[in-house]
Structure formats: structure tokens, C-alpha cells
Amino acid sequence: MGDYLLLIDGSSLLSTQYFGNLPREILYAKKQEEKEAWYHKIMMTSKGVYTNGIFGFLRYLFKIIKEQKPAYLAVAWDLTRDTFRRELYADYKGNRSETPEPLREQFALCQEVLANMGICQLMDEHFEADDLCGSMAKKFESQLPVKILTKDNDYLQLVTDNTTLWLMHSSAEKTLRWTLCWARSASR
């Protein structure tokens, strides 16, 4: 708790909460048509706006703010898959499936909600959320401790004496905390 910067991979948290709050019928469906047949069961507003991911995202965010009380907070977003890495290597993340429409619709709305709450957001169409979090961590870790929340193991390379990683499980309620000593002992 206290005087530190908390960086959240918003794309990772929203996706985790979206999939964690889906009806079982969608999770276990094999074909896209079967999944789409159950979209009406996903949490949504009376106007048909999907909200299951946003609901989980905000619930988790409020819990972190209440329990951890970070002095500074920023949420980073992936805006597109066509970042500088795809320009360098056309097949970068080429094996990923398309983002489901009910999830895709929630990104802009979640960003709007956070903007209305006054939460700092980091986004750039040429960079991924992990690039933005990494840059912020490197910029500020000499001034104050940095903690990063994500589900992405790629962030482990950012762990230092002053940068800690909170790595979410599939169940976003469970979070591993990676510090430099854990990262060093794991590599031995």
C-alpha cells in the first residue's frame, strides 16, 4: 500500500474479465455459430450493450484501489494488432483468433468510463500495452516503486529491484506477485 505507481494492462484485464464472466454455453461451444447463438445470455444493458467484461474490470479495479491504495494509477491499452512489430514481422501474433464481437464492443466503453472517472490511460496505435507499461516502469522506477498488473507472462522481463509484477491467473481473483528474487530463483 502507499506511495507507488500501479500500471494495469487494461486489455489483459478486460479480456480476462470478459471470458471469466461468460455463460458456460459459450465457453464450451466448439463452433463460432454455437457461441453466437448464446450471445443473448451475456450480461448487457437494456439497450443491448454488452457489459460483462466492463463489470468485472471495474469490480477488480475498485477492489485493487480500495485494498492497495496506489498513489498513482495508469491503465494501458492495445488499440490494434497492427503495431510496429507487425510492420517488422507480418506474422507477428498471426495465430491469434479474432476478438469476439461482444468483447470488442466493450473496449471503447470501458475506456470512456475510465476517462470519466479521471483515470490516466495510455494508448498508442503503434505500441502494445506492454510496451507502454514497460516504458512507464523504466521512466519512474528510479523515483518510486512500480507495480504492474497483467495476465501476460511477457511482462516478467520488466521485473527489477523496484518493479514488481502482479500476474493474474485465469481466475482474476487470484494473483501471483513476482519480485526480483522470485524471477532470479525461477531461472536457476
Q: Which sequence ranges carry the predicted segments?
A:
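Non-catalytic, usually N-terminal nucleic-acid engagement modules in DNA/RNA processing proteins
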Residues: 1-74, 84-87
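Structural beta-sheet core signal
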Residues: 6, 74-77, 148, 167
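Residues immediately flanking
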Residues: 10, 79, 153
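Short, glycine/charged-enriched secondary-structure capping and boundary segments
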Residues: 20-23, 89-91, 161-165
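Extended two-metal-dependent nuclease catalytic cores across DNA- and RNA-processing enzymes
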Residues: 30, 40-44, 94-188
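Generic hydrophobic, aliphatic-rich segments that mediate packing or membrane embedding
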Residues: 53, 57-60, 80, 85-88, ...
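Short beta-strand-loop/turn "lid" adjacent to the catalytic site in phosphate-handling enzymes
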Residues: 73-98
